[in-house]
A protein has these predicted regions:
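Extracytoplasmic and endomembrane cell-envelope/extracellular-matrix remodeling and assembly machinery
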Residues: 2-3, 7-34, 39-209
Length: 209
């Protein structure tokens, strides 16, 4: 995941459906550039490009059916062995959704603007400054971890915040956040050195948690 996404204790872009989908596409393109066929690239999404390259070497074929039937790699288990077939099944169901599920009505996709922050900004301050609720901002930016929404960390500088077009005015909205609420540094982590006699409940009590 870290090849194409930011994953740390403040941001986890795997939780953002838009960013993670884009990253998945980038990974598939990378797998294809390494392995040369889409069946292998898709299987590598589960098993890794290196693992599939090893399977190709050991079976001396790029035919996914022959690899599935003959490759005996210890890590090549049920999920990897059936990943491509499952993809084909999902694709078939999606193409014939009406037959399988009836008349499904999808909600229209939201229209977002992405605003790249120019400083570290508290999430609640950012939301109130641009006129949206904190809950709405959180729902639209799931890549930010709970520490941001709980106020323990700020939205990082350079983070691309999604805001719904219909909820904010046109034009640059960053100036709506006053300079006094923009910081050059992230909120520092709290460190504590365990002392003799400490227990988890004692430490938690000292930090009111």
């Amino acid at each position: 995941g870290q090849r194409f996404m930011r994953i740390d204790h403040i941001v986890d872009e795997r939780m953002d459906p838009y960013t993670s989908t884009s990253a998945a596409m980038s990974l598939l393109e990378y797998n294809y550039s390494v392995l040369g066929t889409w069946p292998l690239a898709l299987t590598a999404y589960n098993h890794g490009a290196g693992g599939i390259a090893r399977a190709v070497r050991e079976t001396e074929t790029t035919d996914i059916e022959k690899i599935v039937a003959n490759y005996k790699g210890r890590a090549f288990g049920f999920a990897s062995r059936n990943f491509y077939a499952q993809f084909l099944a999902v694709n078939e169901v999606e193409k014939n959704a009406l037959e399988y599920f009836g008349d499904v009505r999808f909600n229209p996709a939201p229209n977002f603007r992405e605003v790249q922050t120019d400083a570290f900004i508290d999430a609640e301050v950012f939301a109130s400054s641009i006129g949206v609720s904190l809950e709405q901002l959180r729902d639209d930016n799931r890549g930010l971890r709970p520490v941001v929404w709980e106020g323990n960390k700020r939205i990082p500088a350079g983070f691309r915040v999604k805001v719904r077009e219909e909820l904010v005015p046109s034009g640059d909205i960053l100036p709506m956040v006053l300079a006094d609420f923009k910081f050059a540094m992230q909120t520092p982590d709290i460190a504590y050195v365990v002392e003799r006699g400490d227990s988890l409940s004692v430490i938690a009590g000292r930090f009111n948690t």
